[in-house]
C-alpha cells in the first residue's frame, strides 16, 4: 500500500465555495551556485465545511481528483490566524 502524501501550507485565498488555494513553500538548491532558493507552489484544495480563512497554516493530503484542478483535501488547521 502506498503512503499517503501530506503537506503543510498557508491559505492565500478562500473565495470559492468549499475550496481554497494554498501556497506550499520549499527550498531548492541552485544547480550552479549552490544557493538555496525559496520556491512556491499553489494548490487548490477541497474544504468541505469552509473552515479555513486566509493566513491559516493547514495540513492537506492527496486524494482522488475532485475536479479539474482539485486533488488535495484539508486534513486539519494547525494554526488559526487572528486579525
UniProtKB/Swiss-Prot annotation:
Alphabetical list of NCBIfam families matching this protein: PRK05610.1, uS17_bact
Protein name (database record): Small ribosomal subunit protein uS17
Purpose of the protein: One of the primary rRNA binding proteins, it binds specifically to the 5'-end of 16S ribosomal RNA.
One Pfam family per UniProt: Ribosomal_S17
Keywords for the protein's UniProt record, in alphabetical order: Ribonucleoprotein, Ribosomal protein, RNA-binding, rRNA-binding
Keyword ATP-binding: no
Cleaved signal peptide residues: none
SUPFAM superfamilies for this protein: Nucleic acid-binding proteins
